[in-house]
């Protein structure tokens, strides 16, 4: 009898795990790590992002537009504070030298609920020292002025502007909402191939 109960329990547990996997898979593509936290830290260093909107001359914290999953809601209306063209960000780094990258995933949701991932290229302007590799892996890598890929800065500008002229809004239909995940992560120097799964830096 005990054996039968245990077997039944195993079947129930497997079913629950399968259900969770199905539900979670619709959102799994939207994160580059198992955690939705914006910060990634190790004992020897810590990195984080300061995300805000530049409304004219006023710097407005983006926290007001951040949901429980760490995603920022962006507006397509130029008159709104959280217009995607107003998005700005800095990256902070503390501790030992590290290789740093920022992963950016955009979620476009149509009026009928259909979700498209990174459907429209968003032409942010990145500060000097950053390499835009989003076409390949949705990430922007810190290259540094010497292209060494080693970050020793305390605070570095990341998103500094938006190229309105090259933004193709023709594919955007009425009722679309946009959210973005900005996730900073870092690895010890010389360990990025194992952790990030790349043989060399994208600019090499």
What are these regions (language model features)?
Residues 29-204:
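Surface-exposed, hydrophilic segments of mature proteins
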């Amino acid at each position: 009898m005990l054996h039968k109960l245990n077997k039944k329990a195993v079947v129930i547990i497997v079913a629950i795990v399968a259900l969770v996997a199905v539900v979670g898979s619709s959102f799994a593509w939207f994160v580059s790590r198992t955690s939705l936290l914006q910060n990634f830290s190790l004992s020897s260093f810590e990195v984080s992002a300061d995300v805000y909107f530049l409304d004219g001359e006023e710097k407005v914290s983006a926290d007001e537009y951040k949901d429980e999953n760490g995603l920022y809601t962006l507006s397509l209306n130029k008159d709104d504070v959280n217009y995607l063209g107003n998005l700005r960000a800095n990256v902070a780094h503390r501790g030992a030298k590290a290789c740093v990258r920022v992963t950016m995933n955009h979620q476009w949701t149509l009026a009928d609920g259909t979700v498209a991932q990174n459907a429209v290229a968003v032409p942010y302007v990145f500060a000097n020292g950053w390499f835009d590799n989003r076409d390949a892996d949705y990430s922007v890598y810190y290259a540094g002025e010497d292209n060494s890929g080693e970050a020793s800065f305390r605070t570095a500008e990341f998103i500094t502007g938006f190229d309105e002229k090259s933004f193709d809004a023709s594919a955007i239909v009425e009722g679309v909402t946009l959210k973005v995940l900005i996730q900073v992560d870092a690895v010890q120097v010389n360990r990025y191939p194992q952790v990030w799964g790349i043989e060399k830096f994208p600019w090499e």
